[in-house]
Every structure is written in C-alpha cells, then in structure tokens.
C-alpha cells in the first residue's frame, strides 16, 4: 500500500499544476506517462479502483481547501483536475494509443478511458478499431464507448462480427453507450451471434435504445439457459416500455435465480405494469432474498395500488430492517389510503431512525385522524426530518386536537420546523 501511494504521489506531482481549474488543460504527456507507470506498479485492486473513479468527482471547487490536511501538497488537486479534462497533447495521445495493447488489463483500460475522453480524431479511432491485435480492437471499442463517439458507429457495427469475442462484445457495449438508433439493425443481428457474451452485450445495447419495436429480438432471451442473459433481457425489456412484455416479466418473477427476479421486478416497475401487483405482493412476503423483497416494495410504491397496503403493512414485520424501511416508504406512495395500519403506527417508534422517518412520513401522508397522537409524539423526536414530517402531517389534518402538538413545535430548536409549525397552525385555525 505504501509503495502504491508513493507511485501515485509521484504521478500527481509530475508536471505540477496550480492554475485555476477553468484554465487547466487536459493532462500532458508527462502526467499521462507518470500515471500509467504508477498504475502498472501498484496493487491491481488499487489500480482498478482508480480506473473506475478516474474523472469522477475530482474537480477542485474549494480554493480554501477546507477538509484537507494542512500538509497536503497543493499541486495534487490540479493534477487530478487535469485528468478530468480532455487530453489534447499529441504526445499524450500517441502514448495512450500505444498503451492499448499492454499486457496489464487495468492500465490498458485507464489508457482507453483517457483516450475516449480525449481530442483523438475519429480517423485514429477507426484505425485502432481495425488493428490486427484483438486486444487493441477491444480497447479502442471501449474508448469509443466511453467518449460516446458517434463518428465511429459504422466501425463499431462492423466490429460486432469480429471473430474474437472481446472486441465484438465491447463493440456492442459501446453502441449501447452511444445510443444511436441507426445501430439497431446491426445489434438485432448480433443478438443471434454464436458468442454468448456478444449476445449479452447486444441485448443490453438494444435496451439502451428504449424502443418497443425491439421487443421481439430480446423477449426470447428471457428463456436463455444463462441467468445473466435472462436478467439482462429483463432489464432491457423494462427500458423498452412495451405493453406486450408484462406477462413474460411476471413469469420471470418465479425464476430460480435471484438476479433475474430482481431485474424482472425492476422492469415491471419501470413499465408501471399494474397486472403484476398481485404477483409482486406475493413475492414481497415470500421471497427468500431480501433484496428481491426490497425491490418489490419499491415497485408496489411505484404502482400505487391501494390494495397493496395490507401486504406492505405485513412487510413492516419482516426480519430485515431494509425491507421494513422500503415497505414504510412505499406506503406513502399508495393512492386512496385513508386509514393507517397499526403496524405503520408502531414503526414510528422504531429504534431505527430511517424506518422511523419513513413511517412518520407515510403516516403524515395518509392523514388518518386516529393517528394524531402518534404524530404528536414524533414532534419531540431527535431527528429533525421526523419532527418536520410530523408537524406537516398534523397541519394537514386541520383539526383542533392537533394544536397542542403544533404549539410545542413553535419552540423547536430548528428554524425550519418552527416555520412549518407556524404555517400548520395557520391552516388549523382557518
């Protein structure tokens, strides 16, 4: 770890920085070379973490450097910021292109990511996509996808038929990232490729186009022997927003693989498939996987059917607190609910702050006068958001019995709660 950090500090301070962020160019060749060398010598896990986060949330926006250690080198932020910019240095571009064939997969990926976000010409990318080396073709396809380079679309479509799986599958992924409907025909053909990985990438990419006319190409994949393919197909179908896939996705709720069931639940929520309500309610209460249960609760909230109140209330007693939280949150979304279940009232006193918060917000949303005391009790909660929800809920009831609780809230330590209490009292006394 110390060795890794040593290399990274050497990279970050190479070719220093310090100009305002809006004037900083992309990284030059010295900085790019130092970064790639550092990553080549560090722990593979660290390299992969940096590759994932490269360019994300790195821009320095606090000249005062608050929250930074006082002895931290000031140049490091500038070095990081330069890598969020577009590389334009011709020598850096040459180095990045030359690194696309390196043996180190992580370094290769970082180089491709930087190249994709750079000023590299379409002609150079197309040349790399046709390189004799499958490794370079795959890396170039990744670069084209990262940069969403529409000017490489035809070359990527051609690459879908590559005899090597890596470049062909990466071309499918890149076309999905580019989102150009003109690629549909090539992707429709590729879902029938002999390589499972190419079929997977192509099905995913068709989903990214969000066009219901491609349902016929992806729907059969819900019966594929590979659970990853079935899950990807379910996700893609959800994005296509076709009313013709509801029954097939409901059928996928009984898939033996948890990832497929989760994807089917999410897709049904995206489609607002109301015919799935009963099946989702059953899965919420009976599935062996808590993540599937949580997705079911969220989906039922999206579908908003009043009949889901009873199963969601039962889910408040689930052994998994995250399922309880999701159920409490979903209840607030249901339509035409006027009577709060006892389980929801009990959840407002939970020791878990998030569950208590979700339950209080749902209770306030329902506005059942029988729960007035439960909301009044939450006016003294230690959590500001809970107090605020309770005050707003009491105000919406517009009944004199809420006045004592709202009057107490006028002395709350938080000004937002005090303002809400004053407004709620105004409504109550109208």
Protein language model regions, located:
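N-terminal leader/linker segments that initiate helical-solenoid repeat arrays
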Residues: 12-90, 106
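Short inter-helical turns and helix N-cap capping residues of alpha-solenoid HEAT/ARM repeat scaffolds
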Residues: 42-43, 71-73, 103-104, 132-133, ...
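Amphipathic alpha-helical scaffolding segments comprising HEAT/armadillo-like alpha-solenoid repeats
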Residues: 26-37, 59-70, 86-101, 119-130, ...
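Conserved hydrophobic register position within alpha-solenoid helical repeats
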Residues: 50, 78-80, 111, 140, ...
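Core register positions within helices of long alpha-helical scaffolds
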Residues: 53-56, 82-86, 114, 143, ...
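Sec-dependent signal peptide recognition
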Residues: 1-10
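Solenoidal tandem-repeat scaffolds enriched in leucines and small polar residues
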Residues: 166-177, 195-208, 226-232, 239, ...
